[in-house]
């Protein structure tokens, strides 16, 4: 208004500047809108903000170690004086109760006692293990009825002189030969240097007139034929092994003599094989 009055010129004396305030609804709406706006929060810069980033920065990134030195900052140590240290004097030997005395003088006696206890324990454990193993092995052995069947009783009076009789014993052929006096003298006169498997005739018999053998050839397990071959004893038809009347190999591929089983004479007319 003042600039208009200044430029009016001749109308200036009759002009005057006035101002009037008029209330409007827009002012009330602006005041209400200003009052509804929340005030921004005020943060305390002195108080640390706890967040994942701030806490991760304070966490240790290397293994924790303890350092001791002159330039290391000191720490507070909390010690307790109310803890009782256990006393093991009741379990210790009298020779080592004195802290000011060396225990080397009694070390030999203490070691000897320890060795004695260890040895006694080892002997006891060994004996117990031996008993267990013996019982286990004996449980797998043949029973009494099986052992009884493993023996055969032969009546010698049924075998005439100069003849050979075959029996079945433990699934194998058993030869019982009643030798003549001529055969006994002939086999006893054989020199050991002539034999492939040197063995004297008297070492293979308990009674010279009775020759008991297992009738299995020592070459490949064939059954020899009695009273046959070049030496009048046994002959293997499979590969031509010749045995004499004492069952000793004399010719052919067989490497060993015929096997002599375990037997026992229970009388003049009875023998038990097995």
UniProtKB/Swiss-Prot annotation:
Broad class of where this protein is predominantly found: mitochondrion
Residues that bind [2Fe-2S] cluster: 217, 219, 236, 239, 241
Topology of this chain in the membrane: Single-pass membrane protein
Catalytic activity: a quinol + 2 Fe(III)-[cytochrome c](out) = a quinone + 2 Fe(II)-[cytochrome c](out) + 2 H(+)(out)
Mitochondrial intermembrane face residues: 141-274
GO cellular component: mitochondrial inner membrane; mitochondrion
Subcellular localization, as worded in the UniProt entry: Mitochondrion inner membrane
Keyword Zinc: no
Membrane-side (Mitochondrial matrix) residue stretches: 79-103
Transmembrane domains' residue ranges: 104-140
Domain Rieske: 187-272
MF annotations from Gene Ontology: 2 iron, 2 sulfur cluster binding; metal ion binding; ubiquinol-cytochrome-c reductase activity
UniProt PTM: Proteolytic processing is necessary for the correct insertion of UQCRFS1 in the complex III dimer. Several fragments are generated during UQCRFS1 insertion, most probably due to the endogenous matrix-processing peptidase (MPP) activity of the 2 core protein subunits UQCRC1/QCR1 and UQCRC2/QCR2, which are homologous to the 2 mitochondrial-processing peptidase (MPP) subunits beta-MPP and alpha-MPP respectively. The action of the protease is also necessary for the clearance of the UQCRFS1 fragments.
A single BP term in Gene Ontology: respiratory electron transport chain
Disulfide bonds: 222-238
Keywords from the UniProt entry: 2Fe-2S, Disulfide bond, Electron transport, Iron, Iron-sulfur, Membrane, Metal-binding, Mitochondrion, Mitochondrion inner membrane, Respiratory chain, Transit peptide, Translocase, Transmembrane, Transmembrane helix, Transport
EC numbers: 7.1.1.8
PROSITE patterns the record matches: RIESKE
Entry note: cofactor: Binds 1 [2Fe-2S] cluster per subunit. Fe-S cluster delivery to the Rieske protein is mediated by components of the iron sulfur (Fe-S) cluster assembly machinery that reside in the mitochondrial matrix (including HSC20 and LYRM7).
Required cofactor(s): [2Fe-2S] cluster
Residue ranges that the Swiss-Prot or TrEMBL entry lists as coiled coil: none
InterPro entries in alphabetical order: bc1_Rieske_TM_sf, Globular_prot_asu/bsu, Rieske_2Fe-2S, Rieske_2Fe-2S_sf, Rieske_Fe-S_prot, Rieske_Fe-S_prot_C, Rieske_TM, Ubiquinol_cyt_c_Rdtase_Fe-S-su
Record-linked PANTHER family: CYTOCHROME B-C1 COMPLEX SUBUNIT RIESKE, MITOCHONDRIAL
Similarity-based family: Belongs to the Rieske iron-sulfur protein family.
Extra information: The Rieske protein is a high potential 2Fe-2S protein.
Name assigned to this protein: Cytochrome b-c1 complex subunit Rieske, mitochondrial
Gene: UQCRFS1
